[in-house]
Amino acid sequence: MADESETAVKLPAPSLPLMMEGNGNGHEHCSDCENEEDNSHNRSGLSPANDTGAKKKKKKQKKKKEKGSDMESTQDQPVKMTSLPAERIQEIQKAIELFSVGQGPAKTMEEASKRSYQFWDTQPVPKLGEVVNTHGPVEPDKDNIRQEPYTLPQGFTWDALDLGDRGVLKELYTLLNENYVEDDDNMFRFDYSPEFLLWALRPPGWLPQWHCGVRVVSSRKLVGFISAIPANIHIYDTEKKMVEINFLCVHKKLRSKRVAPVLIREITRRVHLEGIFQAVYTAGVVLPKPVGTCRYWHRSLNPRKLIEVKFSHLSRNMTMQRTMKLYRLPETPKTAGLRPMEKKDIPVVHQLLSRYLKQFHLTPVMNQEEVEHWFYPQENIIDTFVVENANGEVTDFLSFYTLPSTIMNHPTHKSLKAAYSFYNVHTQTPLLDLMSDALVLAKMKGFDVFNALDLMENKTFLEKLKFGIGDGNLQYYLYNWKCPSMGAEKVGLVLQ
């Protein structure tokens, strides 16, 4: 078991940005896509673990229940609506319906089973309770694709962002930095650097029209964004050209204007125009229907700072000194021949990765150009280290990417530097040794925490290396593709 000196770390609960082109019905109100402020995409699992915060939440919930009793009593009374227009009556009825089912997104399959998914029932995805034994598309590729963009609310206009323009890239960075996913207690917000955004959004095959922005007509201010990038995905025995949808973000002041659903439908339309009809995506909420469920684990590298910013806390019978001793790491890696990846290593890293991923059911299929893009080291973005043996052969590699978070409202600490396990391939070096060295390298580079999902073979080292389990799941989804679900150990895909 993970040590008690750190509690489970909560995952944020983003709702999901994905391909949602309406079947002539438009975007219907439903419990899983109603809260527009949740419409931001996050895979990081970075959130504080703080008992006092949980207690405050419980107190708030009690107060809400007390207030709610008045509302419940009024709902029992017959409401006179004869003087209201029909549209207004429908809005009130929808609001009452949403209130009754609870507006928060479902975090577990049990919660999800009690929800109605009116919108998702119209989409080419399996139903939540459906047992899938077949493989293939839910619906055939579309021939008749809408040619004109979807209509935005008055005063807003579409803009394909040119991220090669440093000014435009800075605008996107600012939008995300000020409005993107926060944790449940509003203590941390993801801080994607401009350079990281270029890495994540411009892999080989990227298209400018898939960097889909929304601007205010009068001021040209960027107030919304969604993106797609191409990806060849191997799912069981099939290789399929898909997209990954990411970075759905709407300015906080516009979240009542229903901009997010239009963004989602528009990126879907643009992807369909390129002849792609499947997508892969992840979310911290349960929707119809996950193909796999993974959990984030967190390894303290700088326990004092993590405790000071309330990312974690001291448990009973643990002092700060004992906690720091518990998480102390060697000064240097122990694997002989471990060095940063170089350009000459691209072919062998490609070969090692391709062979290694064959044992999993959901994986990327990369060519050498893509391997260079995703793995060649870039400072403060992606780190890859290879193991070269005495004969000059590269036999193993480890990799992790950088995603800091802004720490809000703390007097001294402004940023939390997190490393995220990417792909780690072993043939000669034991995976436990490889990942122990990954922790040492991350600590040497100034990271505060090292995060990893329990996918692939990661479960074999998480507890042994003193990772603590997070308390939220990351769901993997496929759009317009049916296949049996799989355990986390068969998921071989890591999304930024």
UniProtKB/Swiss-Prot annotation:
Ubiquitous. This is Glycylpeptide N-tetradecanoyltransferase 1. It comes from Mus musculus (Mouse). InterPro entries: Acyl_CoA_acyltransferase, NMT, NMT_C, NMT_CS, NMT_N. Residues 1-82 are annotated as: Disordered. It is a peripheral membrane protein. It catalyses: N-terminal glycyl-[protein] + tetradecanoyl-CoA = N-tetradecanoylglycyl-[protein] + CoA + H(+); N-terminal glycyl-L-lysyl-[protein] + tetradecanoyl-CoA = N-terminal glycyl-(N(6)-tetradecanoyl)-L-lysyl-[protein] + CoA + H(+). Disruption phenotype: Complete embryonic lethality. Embryos die between 3.5 and 7.5 dpc. Residues 55-66 have a biased composition (Basic residues). SUPFAM superfamilies: Acyl-CoA N-acyltransferases (Nat). The modification Phosphoserine is found at residues 31, 47, 83.
